[in-house]
């Protein structure tokens, strides 16, 4: 899972990011991850 987070962060707001959110199926995690990318 950690590797997927790093990969999604590297891709940014690309398609892999959306796949990452659907993969976890966790609203809280998805929202948190999205905010982290916007701040970064």
Swiss-Prot record:
On the 2D-gel the determined pI of this unknown protein is: 6.0, its MW is: 21.7 kDa. This is Unknown protein from spot 237 of 2D-PAGE of etiolated coleoptile. Residues 1-11 have a biased composition (Low complexity). Transmembrane segments: none annotated. It comes from Zea mays. Residues 1-40 are annotated as: Disordered. Residues 25-40 have a biased composition (Basic and acidic residues). It comes from the Eukaryota. Signal peptide: none annotated. To tomato abscisic stress ripening proteins.
């Amino acid at each position: 899972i950690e590797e997927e987070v790093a990969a999604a962060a590297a891709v940014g707001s690309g398609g892999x990011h959306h796949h990452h959110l659907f993969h976890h199926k966790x609203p809280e995690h998805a929202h948190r991850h999205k905010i982290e990318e916007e701040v970064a």
